[in-house]
Amino acid sequence: MKTVLIIGADFVPSSLPPATRIRFFVSHLPEFGWHPIVLTTKPEFYEGKFDPENEHLLKNDLEVIRVSAFSTRVTRKLGIGDIGMRSLLQHWKAVKRICSSRKIDSILIPVPPSITMVLGRMAYRRFKIPYVIDYIDPWVTNSYKKVPKTERPPKWALANALSRTVEPYALKHVAHLTGVSQGTTDSVIKRYRWLSDKRATEIPYGAEAADFEYLRSNPRRQTVFDTRDGYFHISYVGACIPAMHETVRALFQAISQGLRDSPTLFSRIRLHFIGTSYAANGNAPRDVQRLACEANIGELVDEQPARVSYLESLQLMLDSQVLLLLGSNEKHYTASKVFPCILANRPLLAIFHEASSVIDIMGQTNAGELVTYSDKEGPGLKVGNIKVALERMLRNENALSQSNMDALRQYSTSAMTARLADCLNSITSIG
């Protein structure tokens, strides 16, 4: 069995997307002849909340090595909170120690935190071990250029300059790129002439049914809303960045029109936006609430910027009448949460760019109501379509999801990990 060292500053018990993606991979890599070693950070150095129960989702025999990080009590004075930056030195020391004493066949680095990708090139220079960078989110992005300066993150200009300087260095000797969508890796390849699409593979998050099986056996009590209060609860769980605000505005305009045309029906709606901020402490502006007030539906919308744990987010999905998925002004944006939304077996409303892979996934699985927009016809021109979809769901509130779970098998986390194993095999000249 070959060995892959997976470097991820965020890992279980963290509930952040990179931690979940790594967990999905390591749960299935042994099925395909790969022994994973996870190199990560000690939980006490995480800035955000974490959930110890997430550890029940790990395999008992998983090998995990944890290192320290610089405390935010010190680094925040320098404007640094990113766990990747705070643990970079400690991770590099551990990489040198592991690669000097163990036979490591390949290295996998999921990003974000994106600065961690430099460890791939550093390890390659020292040990000649081929490395793969796995893009969950792009590091270099122009998405914030399309939004007003007042809505951009305060340190975006500095972060943008850092990404454009460090990313090409980190990718210079990369053996392979993987990403949650082809659009993500295509944008990277377009920037750097030494990369080729033959060295890139699309690997969506995938659907892990075992997580829902665990939750149904160990249900949690969510405190966001009361399932017995008679309202029609629609939930969106996850970050809502400025690049998504145009879609949010279209949704709110549709509800506003619905309140005008069918007040009795639409007044039952309660929209919940949970975990909308990447800020570790959740002390972020309530942009969604602001947009709701601008549309005069503020009393129907509840925004909680602080992230909830992974298992609590799944419980919210199970308890909601309808689940909501929203696209952004990046046409290839793919919401990884599409898979748990389908597995929750709840009615689903998705509003996405026609080029997003979410369109294919929902089409193949027959997973709910889908409203698409394009470069020529943005979300603002689809308000009527959104209103019609909402009205249909409100009038059939007891309808069950008709998702094709058999079609979802091609997107299982095991199937996605098989793609990763093929990549690792190709760069180590086996299989």
Identify the function of each model-found stretch:
Residues R268, H272-S277, G282-R307, L311:
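Nucleotide-activated donor-binding/catalytic signature segment of Leloir-type glycosyltransferases, i.e.
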Residues A9, S71-G81, I98-R102, I129-R164:
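Acceptor-binding helix/loop patch of EC 2.4 sugar-transfer enzymes
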Residues A175, Q315-K331:
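Acidic donor-binding loop of glycosyltransferase active sites
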Residues G183, G206:
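Carbohydrate-associated surface elements
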Residues F225-H245, F252, M416:
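Conserved donor-binding/catalytic core segment of Leloir-type glycosyltransferases
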Residues M1-I65, H176, G258, P263, ...:
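N-terminal subdomain of nucleotide-sugar transferases
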Residues I115-V118, M122-R126, W156-G179:
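Membrane-proximal helix-turn-helix segments that form the acceptor-binding/catalytic region
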Residues V38-S101:
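A conserved catalytic-core segment of Leloir-type glycosyltransferases
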